[in-house]
């Protein structure tokens, strides 16, 4: 069963950590780039009070979930990681939604539900992870783009 502990070689663990770190760096860099570009177009400051509050609201659940996932990864509980990343990402979106678009809250709740569903059906965790982080992000982006035209 996927809930069992999986022995991961030090090389395998290093590869997983490098992939995770690379993904994190690319995500943060692209978020900063696109946010900076948008704020520059609007003649606004990138780090105003609202953006600082949003950042803190997002980072508390994200860092908590990231640290928990690292602990579970080192202990060999790999199967639970995709659902947990969905859940903590959803919690971060819900927590940060009071500082941004109202649709963010709904996306967060959907991510949490997908994560909880993935915990129940752990063998489909990676597929549900791809659905939550891939398909749902695209759908959300299309909805926001249509609702808030530039």
Predicted regions and their residues:
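Phenylalanine-focused residue identity feature
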Residues: 33-34, 47, 74-77, 88, ...
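Membrane-proximal helix-loop-helix units in multi-pass membrane proteins
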Residues: 45-104
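Membrane-interface elements of multi-pass transporters and channels
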Residues: 37-41, 74-78, 146, 150
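Terminal transmembrane helical module of multi-pass membrane proteins
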Residues: 92-150
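Membrane-interface helix-boundary signature
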Residues: 10-17, 75-79, 104, 122-126
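Selected alpha-helical membrane-embedding segments in polytopic membrane proteins
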Residues: 1-66, 70
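Hydrophobic alpha-helical transmembrane segments of polytopic
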Residues: 20-24, 58, 82-85, 89, ...
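Membrane-embedded alpha-helical transmembrane segments of multi-pass integral membrane proteins
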Residues: 26-30, 64, 68, 89-92, ...
């Amino acid at each position: 069963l996927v809930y069992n502990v999986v022995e991961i070689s030090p090389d395998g663990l290093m590869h997983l950590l490098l992939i995770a770190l690379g993904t994190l760096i690319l995500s943060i860099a692209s978020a900063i780039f696109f946010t900076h570009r948008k704020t520059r177009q609007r003649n606004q400051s990138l780090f105003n009070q609202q953006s600082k509050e949003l950042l803190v609201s997002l980072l508390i659940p994200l860092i908590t979930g990231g640290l928990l996932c690292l602990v579970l990864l080192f202990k060999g509980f790999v199967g639970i990681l995709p659902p947990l990343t969905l859940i903590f990402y959803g919690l971060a979106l819900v927590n940060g939604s009071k500082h941004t678009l109202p649709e963010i809250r709904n996306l967060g709740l959907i991510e949490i539900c997908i994560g909880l569903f993935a915990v129940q059906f752990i063998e489909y965790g990676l597929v549900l992870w791809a659905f939550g982080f891939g398909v749902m992000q695209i759908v959300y982006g299309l909805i926001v783009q249509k609702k808030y035209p530039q």
